[in-house]
Amino acid sequence: MTIEFDCIVAGISCVDLLIGPLNLDQPLNQEGTWALDTITPTVGGNVSNSSIALARLGSRTAALSLAGADEWGGFLISKLQDEGVNTSRFQQRDGLDTSATAVLMNSKLEHIFAYKPGASEAIDRSLIDDNLDFIAQSKYLLLGYYGLLPNIEPVLHEVLEAVQKTGCKTALDCAGGGGGITPLDKCLPYLDIYIPTEHEAESQTGLRVPQDMIAKFRDCGAAGVVGVKRGEQGILLSPIEGQFLTIAAIKPPSPVVNTTGAGDSFYGGLISGLSRGMDIESAARLGTATASWCVTGMAVSYTHLTLPTNREV
């Protein structure tokens, strides 16, 4: 099988409306009208964020997702195409509304989400099973979000196993607080990469120490690269059982504007590095550099992301 892609990003895609600034500590109905700096439409979800980061880093990238046959769906797909992302298997389906998120931000750049699941809620195992021929043409499949895919999570371990049998490596992204250890425990043996945030890992394991969280994932059968994203404290990685690497966070090249999509961008940078033959430490540093670029714009698609040089990484 000819390898056509470095990574296919599958799962949730949505249109994001970036709205702010708002006083998130004050009930919205206390003001009749809010004067805002921005109401900006862009694209979000792991499929949009990670695939755009990958494409801008020069990786051959495809998106595998589901949207409605509506204007927002057309907007979403056209944005990805403009970034050079292959959307040949990105479905628009009649009778569904494209998923959308209102990202409500305050003046300190903190945010909360108001999310309409829409088409993403209809994602089931057929999204992967019906496209295994396509996935077999890729080095990696990055799937997300665990915690927000109720129709696929009960059989997710079977889906990941089927992907690995094609020769494609697997990675899983999280959201929605991270979900629980079940059914993640069944999935970990079929993941080549799994790096949740510290908050997500705590929710999943009930533990507070990152090394203990990773040990819990290993106890569940994780054999690939496991780690914990720790924000400004960087990344704790375990490439193999018993080995730990601390990857420092990289200072953003300009002031932070919005942190939405930083975790997805980290995954994009990491997989971009691995697909071009970097060792895990160098690839993870590319991931942290990519995340640091992401936060300097209103969203991944609005950030002028260019490939960091070896010196910058």
Region locations from a protein language model:
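Glycine-rich phosphate/adenosyl-contacting loop at the front of the ribokinase-like
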Residues: 1-64, 71-82, 253
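Conserved phosphate-binding/catalytic region of the ribokinase-like
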Residues: 1-21, 162, 210-305, 311
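A short, aliphatic-rich alpha-helical micro-motif
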Residues: 2, 132-136, 188
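Conserved N-terminal subdomain of the carbohydrate kinase-like
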Residues: 31-41, 56-143, 305
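Short, conserved phosphate/pyrophosphate- and ester-handling motifs at nucleotide-, phospho-/glycolipid
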Residues: 54, 197, 263
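Short beta-strands and strand-loop turn motifs
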Residues: 113-115, 140-146, 171-174, 195-198
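Glycine/threonine-rich flexible loop motifs
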Residues: 148-154, 205
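Conserved phosphate/ATP/ADP-binding segment of small-molecule kinases
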Residues: 157-169, 174-246
